[in-house]
Amino acid sequence: MTEEEIEQAAYKDYLEIRTRVQIAFERFAQSMRISGKHKRAIHSLSESHTLCTQARNTWNVNFRYTGYTPDGKINIVCYLYIPLRRENGVDYLFMNDPKCFKVERVSSHFLQRYKERYLDPAGIDLKGVHPAIYFMQNNEDRRQAYYLPKNWTDEELAEKCFLVSGQGLSLIKLCGKTLTYITFLDQENLSRYKAQVCEEEEYLHLMGKAKDSDILGLQAISKKLCADIE
């Protein structure tokens, strides 16, 4: 199947199961809205289902309660995913927002690099969780990076970018409604140049959020970064 055909098939499944996912989501959210008189067992803070579509695709659904937001709203994340078997490995398709169609495709190459460059060096015990799920659960802070390689073509600039998170850099490609994770670069194993990209990304991110009282401190960080450039 081509990328377009995969997206079309995912969209058909999305239209078929989104209402069921939303109903299950609301039911789980309601069960988590508890008063201070009640306590929840750890195992009950998540819930899993499987949904089979008319196309005989079996989607896995996982809801996780992560607490309350500062304004008192309950915070629950949804992971809706399916394995996509390819000739060179198994990719994973995610449709994590039942209210909006968007596909995130985690490639087998990305997962291999994520394992080699982060999970194994860090000694992460997945406790039975698939690496693709672990990545989604532990990189919710990922955001688009400012950095773009100077040797990228116009086509690459239109389709690709880097996402930066606490665990490292993810190279992604956006085509239609599908975001594909191509490869992973762990901050601890980057070259000195790429490591500095991560530092600069964090600086620029902080600059975007900074108050006037923070600017002098951030300017000092900027001078240090510039001084480190060879």
Model regions and ranges:
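Ribonuclease/tRNase effector modules and their secretory precursors
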Residues: 1-230
